[in-house]
Amino acid sequence: MEKLSANEIRQLWIDFFREKNHFFIESKPLVPQNDDSLLWINSGVATLKDYFTGKKIPPSKRLVNSQKALRTNDIENVGLTSRHHTLFEMLGNFSIGDYFKTEAIDYAYEFLTKKLKLDPKNLFITYYDGDDITFEKWKSLGFSNEKLIKGSKKTNFWDLGQGPCGPCSEIYFDRGPKFDSRGSELIKNEIENDRFIEIWNIVFSEFNNDGQQNYAPLKSKNIDTGAGFERIVSILQDGPTNYDTDLFLPIIAEIEKNTVFRYKIENYFLKKPRQTQINKSFRIIADHIRAITLAINDGVQPSNLHRGYIIRRLIRRAYWNGKKLGISHPFLYKLVEIVGKTLDYRFDIPTISKIILNEEENFAKTLEIGYNLLESQLKINKNQIKPVTVFKLFETYGFPVELTKEILAEKNIDFDLSQLVEFQEKHSQISRAKKTTGMQKVINSLTQIKAKISDFIGYHTHHIETKISFLANKDEEVAETNGENLSYVIFEKTPFYATAGGQKHDQGWIIQNNSTIEILDVFKDKFLNNIHVFKGKIVKNQPVFLKLDTKNRLNLERNHSGTHLLFASLRQEFGSEIKQLGSDNNEDRLTFDFPLNRKPSDQEIKSVENRINSYINQKIKRKYLVTNLEEAQKLNAIMTLEESEYMDPNSLRLVIFDKITTDLCGGTHIENTELLEKFTILSCQSKGSGIYRIRAVTSWNKYFEFLKGKIQEILSKISALKNKIKKIEPNFGLNLPNLVDLEQQFDYLKKIEDDLRIYYKKLLKSQLRIAKSELDANKIIEIGKFSFYLDFNLPLHNLKQIAATWREQNPRISFILGANLVNNEFLIIVSSAILASNQILEKILEIFTGSGGGNYKIAQGKIQKKPEKEVFIKLLWENITEF
C-alpha cells in the first residue's frame, strides 16, 4: 500500500475504469435536475437514475463517475464519529445490461490490489446467502471461508419493496487490532467499529419485485457500485479517521489560524475528553464548510426555505462551533479558497465568501443575545426549557431549532418537540411532498405503447399528410373516437412539437374527412413519441392532414431563442457561473430563473436587455449541429438546459448562434436573430432563496403592448402623486398633452412622474422642518423620572417621520403625537427609545375606542376623536410602572 493524495486516488479510479471501456460522467451539481423526489443528490447513482429506468439512453453501457453528494439526516453524528459527513464523494462504476457479477468482482479486486496496492490479506468480503456465483468468484480469487462472511436478506440484499433489486457484496478493509481487539465478529454482528471499514459495495440488480415479494429475473441485469472516497483516502493515508487526510487537514489548519486551540490526531487513541470536544468542533467546521461552499456554488442561497434552510443551518452550526473554539468573529468565509484546493474544484471564491460572510455577520449580531436568553430561561426554569423559548430563539435570534437542541443536549437537558410541530412546518419548510403541478394524469390506455412508433419532422416541415399509429381514449385503444371526450393520438410523422425543455407545445389542426379538429396538447411518453390530445371524431385507418399554426410557432420560436440569448447575456453580465434553474416559454412570453447572491440592479438588467437587442441588430443566423457528447463538450456547449433529458448522448442537437452561444437544445428556433425584432425585459423579481426570475417578451407587437401597460401604470402613479401634492398645495394643477408616438409618450410621462416625485419630496422636506425645529418646552410633561412630549396638532402627511426624527434627536423623551383624520377620527403615534411604545398605545386604545399596533420603538393607532391632554396625563401617571 502506497500513500497517495486524494486527487491521485480519484484520478486512478477514473483512469482505471476508462481503460475498461467505461464512459466517464462528470460530477453533477448537488441540486437534482428534473427530479422532484430528491432534496439533494445523495448518492453516486442518483444522477444516473434515468439511465437505469430507461427514461434516458446512456452514452455507454459502461459508466464511471466520482459524484459529490450531500446528506444531513444524521447531522448530529458529524464530527462525533470517524466517518459521518454532510458532503461526501462516491466513486462509482456501473453496468447497464453489459457485464455482471464476475467482471464486477474482478474489477474491484484488480483496482484495490493492483492499483491501490492493498494487501488482499486485509480484505474481508460479505455476500448474500444463496448467491453461489458471487461466493465462488471471490473464492477463486484466493479468499478463504473465514474471509467470506455470509449475509442475510437484511444485510446483503437491496430491495425497495417494488421494482429492480438484487443481492450485494461488500468489501471491508481490516485496519488491525489497534483499532479494536475484536475480530470479524464485528462484521458478522453489524457492530459499529473503526477496525473493519466498508470501502466498496457492489449491487447485483438481477430481479424484479412485483410488490408482493414475488421475484422474477430481469432481462437486463445491471451493476451499481459505490466506493467511499473519503474512507479509501483515510486508509491509504493511514489516518485514524476520514478527517485525518489531505481532504480535511488543510481546512483544519486554516481554522487553527483563528484560534489558540489545536486539532490533535493522536487524541484518537489518547481519548482525552477535553481534546475530544475540541477535535469535534474542528471536524464539524471542516465538514460543514465543504458542504456550504459546494452547495452555494451550485446555486443554493442561505434562507429559511427548502435547501436554503439547510445551508443556513450548516453555517450557523459551524459558526457556533467556532464560538466554542474561542472564535468571536466571522471566519468561515476565509475557508472557501482552501476548500476549493482540497476538492480540486474551481469556485467563484469572492462571491461565495461574500455570501457566507453576510450570513456570519447576521448571525453574530443576535447570537450573544439569543444564547444569554437561553441561559437565563434555564436558570429561571431550573434547567427546563419551554417550547415558546425555542420558538423565540428561532424567530427572533435565528437559532435553528436543531442547534438549540444540540446546545441543550450538551447540557444534558431534554425538551419536548411535539409542541413545535406547527412551528417547524411553518419555518423549516423543507417540503417532503412531490410536486404535482404540470404533471400528466394517469392515462391507462397509454401503457399499451411499447416502443417508439412516431417521428417528429417539425424542424423544417409545417404540414403533412400522414397515418395514425395509435388512437385511444382514456382507458383503451380504439378504432375511432366519439368526439365527446378527450382522446389521444400518435401519428407516424408529426410537425407538432411536444412540451419539453421549457418550450410549450405547438398548436394546430388535424384534418380528416372535411373535419378540422384543434390540437389541445402535445406531450412525450417514455419512448419519446409525441402524444397529441384532442376532442373530436377521427378514424384510425384513414389518412389525416396535419397543419401547424405557423404564427403561434413563430412566437414560440422567438421566445425560446430569446431564452438562449438571455442566458448568454446574463453570463456576460454576471459571469460564467450563472446557471439556468428553470425556464418557461410560451407564445406570449418567456421566463428564466437564475441564482445570484444579490438583487440585480436596474442598470445591470438594462445592460442585459441592450446586449440582447445588439444580438438582434447583428442579424446572426441560427445553425444546428447534431453530434455526440464528447464533441459537444469540446465546443463548450451549455449542457444545463432541460431538453437534455430527452436526448440520445450519441446524437445531441446543438443550437448555435455564432459568437454568442452554443447550447444543447431539442426545441425550435428562429432562423436569424433579426426575427426576434425586439427583446424587452418586463421584470426581474426575487423568488426567494437567492433565486431571481426574469420575465420578458419578444417582437415589436409585444413591446408596444408592454409600453401601453406601462403608460397606464405611470398615469395612475401621476394621478396619485397629484392628489398627494394637492393635500399640501390645494391649488396645484397639471395638464398632460396627447402624444401619438408610444415611446415618446412613455418617456415624457416617465419624466413627469419623476419630476412630481421630486417635487413631492421637497414639499415633505419643507414640512419636516417642523420636526427639526426646537421642541416646545410647554408640551413636555414629567411623569416620575420619565419625560413625555404631547402634541396633537401636527400635519398628518409626515407624522411618522416627525415622531421618528424627534425620538432620535431626544432619546430620553417619549413622544405621543397626533393629527386629525377624516370622519372626525384621530391618528395617534407613540415613539420612544426607552419605553415600550406598543404597550403605551395599548393603554391609550383601552380608554379611547380604536385600533392599532406597533413595536417597542414606534406604534400607531386610530381613535374616535381628538383626546384631551389632561386625560392623557392621568393615563400616564396611572400606568407608568407597566411601560
From Swiss-Prot:
GO molecular function: any one?
ATP binding
One Gene Ontology cellular component annotation held by this UniProt entry: cytosol
Q: Does the keyword ATP-binding apply?
A: yes
EC assignment: the record states: 6.1.1.7
Sequence positions that bind Zn(2+): 560, 564, 665, 669
Q: Which SUPFAM superfamilies match?
A: Class II aaRS and biotin synthetases (SSF55681), Putative anticodon-binding domain of alanyl-tRNA synthetase (AlaRS) (SSF101353), ThrRS/AlaRS common domain (SSF55186), Translation proteins (SSF50447)
> Where in the cell?
Cytoplasm
Keyword Transport tagged? no
Task: Report keywords, A-Z.
Answer: Aminoacyl-tRNA synthetase, ATP-binding, Cytoplasm, Ligase, Metal-binding, Nucleotide-binding, Protein biosynthesis, RNA-binding, tRNA-binding, Zinc
Q: Which InterPro entries match?
A: aa-tRNA-synth_II/BPL/LPL, Ala-tRNA-lgiase_IIc, Ala-tRNA-ligase_IIc_anticod-bd, Ala-tRNA-synth_IIc_core, Ala-tRNA-synth_IIc_N, Ala-tRNA_ligase, Ala_tRNA_ligase_euk/bac, Thr/Ala-tRNA-synth_IIc_edit
How the cofactor binds, per note?
Answer: Binds 1 zinc ion per subunit.
PROSITE patterns attached to this UniProt entry: AA_TRNA_LIGASE_II_ALA
Q: A Pfam family this protein belongs to?
A: tRNA_SAD
EC top class, as a word: ligase
A GO biological process held by the record: alanyl-tRNA aminoacylation
Which coenzymes or cofactors are required? Zn(2+)
Role played: Catalyzes the attachment of alanine to tRNA(Ala) in a two-step reaction: alanine is first activated by ATP to form Ala-AMP and then transferred to the acceptor end of tRNA(Ala). Also edits incorrectly charged Ser-tRNA(Ala) and Gly-tRNA(Ala) via its editing domain.
Swiss-Prot/TrEMBL domain comment: Consists of three domains; the N-terminal catalytic domain, the editing domain and the C-terminal C-Ala domain. The editing domain removes incorrectly charged amino acids, while the C-Ala domain, along with tRNA(Ala), serves as a bridge to cooperatively bring together the editing and aminoacylation centers thus stimulating deacylation of misacylated tRNAs.
* PANTHER family associated with the record: ALANINE--TRNA LIGASE, CYTOPLASMIC, ALANYL-TRNA SYNTHETASE
The family line of this record is: Belongs to the class-II aminoacyl-tRNA synthetase family.
Q: Which NCBIfam families match?
A: alaS
Name of the protein this chain belongs to: Alanine--tRNA ligase
Source organism (scientific name): Mesomycoplasma hyopneumoniae (strain 232) (Mycoplasma hyopneumoniae)
- Lineage of producing organism: Bacteria, Bacillati, Mycoplasmatota, Mycoplasmoidales, Metamycoplasmataceae
Gene that produces this protein: alaS
